[in-house]
Swiss-Prot record:
Gene3D superfamilies: Aspartate Aminotransferase, domain 1 (3.90.1150.10), Type I PLP-dependent aspartate aminotransferase-like (Major domain) (3.40.640.10). Pfam families: GDC-P. The keyword Calcium does not apply. Its EC number is 1.4.4.2. This is Probable glycine dehydrogenase (decarboxylating) subunit 1.
Length: 447
């Protein structure tokens, strides 16, 4: 009899041993020297009955802090946003419930159309001409943009702003190390990229210039100035953007960006230990054949009816492994679907209104924090995040706020030693006036 949870019974094991011509597990592993073989029993507890198992995991889950119970002012790349209820309903349908693009695309027209709509909406937001079907997350997309730029320009120097998310820079450096590429960081000045330092670093060996807009500190970057420096030579201009912010801001494509990447988490993807997310990657037609990942295109069949296909597949590793544009094979199709459903449900006007509320509520939070004696650092145009400076140790502030029902902002001292005692505060459209007022009052006690 097969067990509900165990993949292999005693009879199954014996059948497999007979099939390969050995009598026992001991005989199967006989070539492994006795002195390096594990002896004894594994330290694994006895099996639990289903009600006991559910109770055990429920107890573990109860130790987590849930956003339904706390008001979150934590962002730094993962944000608490409104998710339309229809999103979970659609992505739970069996036809869609996979992280992969279909291997027989001609019989998966619904899934391909959903991905095509995702690509189309990303192009609209970014002001670009081509977008792929998604990537693992924003940092992966950023690293792939840098790799593509180096391949396109035949250069090996990558200039990246220190105002780009630290974890995205870590992923970039990991990718660059294996390919012997040079990553040079551009300093910041008052919370934005230092254009003068960029000018000093830029030379004929530069493959790309990478900035984030809005950047990690929440500030809006001077994209026009950075673009003019980036395109002095053959380098590409790469912009990492929060797609929700692009519902309100002038798109990077309008500033001459060659590649726009980011994380679609603000659209329909919940906060969950930092993932899974959904990276997006958009670029120009000129660079279309160098784009990593899958591309869904629209065409017509032999009867003149509209259809969708995976196109330009000669770029991919299953066609030409040695000359592939990247080693990205799977993607985040399910989360891309969630993002597409969220964007379509909220609509153009809704996305703009949602972005506007982020700006307005962040501005209101700033004013309330100031009124409670809190110092705002690196002030200037921002989207939904800003920096505050506190006199008390931030771990004490975080614990005190949690006890009052708030999840504090991000401790910048963890990744920027010079910003010890500085907190990155995020305010999204789901925060209420009452929550912001009370948060400002509680934080003011540590000013």
């Amino acid at each position: 009899m097969n067990h509900r949870y165990l993949p292999m019974t005693t009879d199954d094991r014996q059948e497999m041993l007979q099939a390969i011509g050995v009598d026992s597990i001991e005989e199967l592993f006989s070539d492994i020297p006795q002195d390096i073989r594990f002896k004894g029993k594994l330290n694994i507890p006895n099996a639990l009955k289903e009600p006991e198992l559910i109770r055990y995991f429920q107890q573990l889950a109860n130790e987590n802090v849930h956003l339904k119970d706390k008001a979150s002012f934590l962002g730094a790349g993962v944000y608490d946003h409104y998710i339309p209820s229809i999103v979970d309903h659609v992505i739970s349908r069996s036809e869609f419930y996979t992280a992969y693009t279909p291997y027989q695309p001609e019989i998966s027209q619904g899934e391909l159309q959903a991905i095509f709509e995702f690509q189309t909406m990303i192009c609209e937001l970014t002001g670009m001409e081509v977008a792929n079907s998604s990537m693992y997350d924003g940092p992966t997309a950023l690293a792939e943009a840098a790799m593509m730029s180096c391949g396109h320009t035949k250069k090996k120097k990558i200039l990246v702003s220190k105002a780009v998310h630290p974890e995205a820079r870590d992923v970039l450096m990991t990718n660059a190390y294996g390919q012997r590429l040079e990553v040079v960081e551009i300093d910041t000045n008052n919370g934005v990229t230092d254009v003068e330092h960029l000018k000093a670093l830029y030379d004929e060996e530069t493959a790309c210039v990478i900035v984030q807009h809005p950047n990690f500190f929440g500030r809006l970057e001077p994209l026009a100035e950075i673009e003019s420096v980036s395109h002095q030579g053959k380098a590409t201009f790469v912009v990492s953007s929060n797609p929700l912010a692009l519902g309100l801001l002038k798109p990077p494509g309008a500033f001459g960006a060659d590649v726009v990447v980011g994380d679609a988490q603000p659209f329909g993807i919940p906060t969950q230990y930092g993932g899974p997310h959904c990276g997006y990657f958009a670029t120009t037609k000129k660079l279309m054949r160098k784009v990593p990942g899958r591309l869904v295109g629209q065409t017509t069949d032999d009867q003149g009816q509209r259809g969708f296909v995976l196109t330009l597949q000669a770029r991919e590793q299953h066609i030409r492994r040695e000359k592939a544009t990247s080693n990205i094979c799977s993607n985040q199709a399910l989360n891309a679907l969630a993002a597409a459903v969220a964007m379509a449900t909220i609509g153009k006007r809704g996305v703009k209104e949602m972005a506007l509320q982020n700006v307005q509520k962040a501005a209101y939070a700033k004013s309330q924090l100031k009124a409670n004696g809190v110092e705002i650092v690196a002030e200037g145009p921002c989207f939904n995040e800003f920096i505050i400076k506190l006199s008390s140790p931030l771990h004490e502030v975080e614990e005190a706020l949690l006890a009052k029902g708030f999840i504090a902002g991000y401790d910048l001292g963890k990744v920027y030693p010079e910003l010890e005692g500085h907190m990155l505060v995020a305010v999204t459209e789901v925060r209420t006036k009452e929550e912001i007022d009370q948060f400002a009052k509680e934080v003011g006690m540590f000013a």
